[in-house]
Amino acid sequence: MLVYLAEYLTQFYTGFNVFSYVTFRAILGLLTAMVFSLWWGPKMIERLQLLQIGQVVRNEGPESHFAKRGTPTMGGLLILAGVFISVLLWGDLGSRYVWVMLFVLGAFGLIGFIDDYRKVVRKDTKGLIARWKYILQSLAALAIAFYLYASAGSEGETQLVLPFFKDVMPQLGAFFILLAYFTIVGSSNAVNLTDGLDGLAIMPTVMVAAAFALIAYLSGHVQFANYLHIPYLPGSGELVIVCTAIVGAGLGFLWFNTYPAQVFMGDVGSLSLGAALGTIAVLVRQEILLVIMGGVFVMETVSVILQVGSYKLRGQRIFRMAPIHHHYELKGWPEPRVIVRFWIISLFLVLLGLATLKLR
């Protein structure tokens, strides 16, 4: 929004031209989202406590989690508010990339809100029925996938980028829709599964978003894109604003979500942030890179699939409890140790993913 005001004011003072630079607006976007989260966080936590919107803890969960019962949840609203305000202020509202991301965050945030509302307000421990949650996620993801395919303006927007391969970028055609759908829905649910310990999901989300900010910037510059053999995507630089807003809002939220957490993000946060990461990966044509950089999310999801599959087929469990972070808790690891080690793994995988841009 302020881009247009700065463009108008440039005729009176050329210094306002600095707002035309994505990097400058990205920094302001990060700071805006972070300051908003830090400023509004205590007020929101107090409000959630007054409304008695507290975390529901399953009786079959680890005993150490019983103390978390009643901790304010739905803190993802704080993250979403910070991201929306930041992007609307510093993003180019004429960019389809910006509106796609706002739609995804809003749609999946609404799904998560309904789920959280049923759990904490209506005291339904199951929340939104899994079937309906999946249907709503699918409708939102398919809407985005069809739109992106129909509005693609270049071949690069529907190519598949393979890490480690320089000149292998097959054209997906209509299969783009299928890949986009599974990437968005899968990423949304993967982050949701990871969000089981204090700060466990938000920090890897911040790391992956920061990495995608760099990739989006490189993809939006023809020289960098050609040098790295990745698709040149005109206008994708505006995704940098969205990514840095997620980083800023996420770090601000982590201030209150770090162990012992004062607030949890809830499904309103985890489903929307996961979908956002998946959508960004689709937009910059780096779905496979998301699997690498978001390896912690993949690990958590695979542990659940293996656990359920093993129990149904063999009647035996592989892990003491799934997702896998609970397995390590039940092995006796203190919660902070599990969290920080998963963060370290995430940092390693993000750096590995970025390295693949050059290892071709």
From Swiss-Prot:
Q: How does it sit in the membrane?
A: Multi-pass membrane protein
What PROSITE patterns does this protein map onto?
MRAY_1, MRAY_2
Q: What class of enzyme is it?
A: transferase
Q: Does the keyword RNA-binding apply?
A: no
- Which controlled-vocabulary keywords does the entry list? Cell cycle, Cell division, Cell inner membrane, Cell membrane, Cell shape, Cell wall biogenesis/degradation, Magnesium, Membrane, Metal-binding, Peptidoglycan synthesis, Transferase, Transmembrane, Transmembrane helix
**Entry annotated with the keyword Plastid:** no
Q: Name one GO cellular component term.
A: plasma membrane
- Reactions mediated catalytically: UDP-N-acetyl-alpha-D-muramoyl-L-alanyl-gamma-D-glutamyl-meso-2,6-diaminopimeloyl-D-alanyl-D-alanine + di-trans,octa-cis-undecaprenyl phosphate = di-trans,octa-cis-undecaprenyl diphospho-N-acetyl-alpha-D-muramoyl-L-alanyl-D-glutamyl-meso-2,6-diaminopimeloyl-D-alanyl-D-alanine + UMP
Designated name of the protein:
Phospho-N-acetylmuramoyl-pentapeptide-transferase
Q: Which organism is it from?
A: Shewanella loihica (strain ATCC BAA-1088 / PV-4)
